[in-house]
């Protein structure tokens, strides 16, 4: 239970309200740098496929991935919106603003994530994410 909302067990379907409640908590954890809180959202046997990073299996590599991700970003502002739900799969639109730790430049990023939920936790996290210097033009994808 999170923020007074119970999450589905097994592979029961998720409601929009449940997904929004989870996303609100995830955003708070990312912006607050709560690595343990984020890792606790995943079961021990989780799988993470994040961008070009090799697939990570288990919470120890996941912790490393999240720690490295947050270490590069200062003044992180995150917005996550659930754009689709298919029973136990949540499709998330993710937008981030931050200052790059090494260059000091303002950055912006956009991504799409698919979370496969099990027992109220993120069993599989798949994400595509791109980032550019804030104000830079994004390349248009060829159709």
Regions found by a protein language model. Give the residues of each.
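Short solvent-exposed beta->alpha transition segments
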Residues: 47-67
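Short, well-ordered alpha-helical segments enriched in acidic and aromatic residues
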Residues: 32-49
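Secondary-structure boundary/capping signal
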Residues: 34, 46, 54, 74-77
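A beta-strand edge to alpha-helix "cap/lid" segment located at domain peripheries
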Residues: 1-14, 18, 63-143
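Short hydrophobic alpha-helical module
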Residues: 29, 41, 68-72
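Residues at alpha-helix boundaries and the short loops/turns that link adjacent helices
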Residues: 13, 29-32, 56
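Amphipathic alpha-helical repeat scaffolds
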Residues: 24-28
């Amino acid at each position: 239970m999170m923020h007074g909302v119970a999450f589905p067990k097994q592979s029961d379907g998720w409601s929009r309200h449940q997904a929004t409640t989870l996303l609100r908590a995830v955003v708070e954890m990312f912006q607050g740098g709560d690595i343990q809180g984020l890792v606790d959202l995943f079961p021990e046997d989780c799988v993470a496929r994040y961008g070009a990073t090799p697939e990570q299996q288990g919470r120890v590599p996941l912790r490393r991935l999240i720690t490295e991700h947050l270490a590069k970003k200062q003044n992180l502002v995150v917005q996550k919106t659930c754009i689709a739900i298919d029973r136990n799969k949540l499709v998330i639109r993710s937008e981030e603003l931050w200052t790059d730790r090494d260059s000091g430049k303002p950055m912006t990023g956009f991504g799409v994530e698919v979370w496969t939920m099990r027992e109220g936790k993120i069993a599989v996290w798949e994400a595509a994410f791109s980032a550019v210097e804030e104000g830079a033009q994004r390349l248009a994808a060829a159709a």
